[in-house]
Amino acid sequence: MRLFIIGNGFDRAHNLPTSYWDFRTHLETHYPDFLAAFEQHYYIVPNDSEEFKKNLLWNDFETNLANIDEDIIIEDALGVEMGLESGDVGIEDTLRIHFRSEYQYISKLAVYLKQWVKTIPLAATRPITSQISNNNKDIFITFNYTSVLEDTYQIDPEKVLHIHGSLREYDDDPILGHGNRNRIEDIKAKRNEAIIWSDEKKVSICRVIEEYYNTTFKNVANYMHKLSSLYKYRPQEIIVIGHSVAGIDLPYYKRINDLTNRKALWKVYYFDKTKEDCMRQSLIEQGISHKRIQMVDCAEFYDLT
């Protein structure tokens, strides 16, 4: 039995528009005012180049969700006049309401993300690899929201785990978020310092930014329980395709390695030759022995193109 770990590169290899830049295009078409306001908090303006927007935010969208410039936000917010007759006395509740409305983008992002996933066209998608077949007993963990495995390859949905949600009725809705816990701890420290100095206005601003970080935080520990069924399958081979083996998803690899008794062979397909060593090292850092890792060009995987 084999376990496939599948990332967004798999969908993109099928020529599906599933990058976060494609998500931005959806927002630009249907929610331009929201997009402009959202990007403004990352100091992106409409006239900026596509390359600049991609590098600053969209190329690594989930990681960059936490990269708002909180110092500038705090400085700007401290200068906001709320028009209260009592000055700054009792201003905290008013400020929290004000800035919550300013920074509650993530709830809308989640709604728009689900809408976008529904628009991704799968009808014309055809198989491009012979390695995935519904005749095998293989099981699948996918980081993708789409149903390419189920629809294009006719894989039994019971064999497919959408670790971060999908459009299936019994799954979580699509989930996105950053993994930068340090930003949360840093803003807590600033809030506590403001409490010491009785700076009610700054306390309120820090709390709202902290809420934003917490709301946009994807705590992978909350989804680890979904992997528990691996213990009974005990795959002999684990195949990674279309995933960068990096970022906030790395803890899953350690957990998968542990649940398979650290015995399975790992065949990892890379798209970019220059990332091969980095991907291998990431796996080693998760406790996977280099002797059990085989790196392969993904062109060998897509043998029906």
Residue ranges and their predicted role:
Residues 1-14, 23, 224-305:
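SIR2/sirtuin-family catalytic core signature
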Residues 5-42, 137-142, 154-161, 167-170, ...:
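Conserved catalytic core of sirtuin-type NAD+-dependent deacylases
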Residues 19-59, 212-219, 287-305:
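Extended charged low-complexity segments that act as oligomerization/scaffolding linkers
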Residues 37-208:
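Extended, H/D-rich, highly charged conserved domains that either
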Residues 119-129, 212-230:
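A Trp-anchored, charged/polar loop motif used as the substrate-binding/catalytic surface
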Residues 195-221, 232-246:
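Acidic/glycine-enriched edge-of-secondary-structure segments
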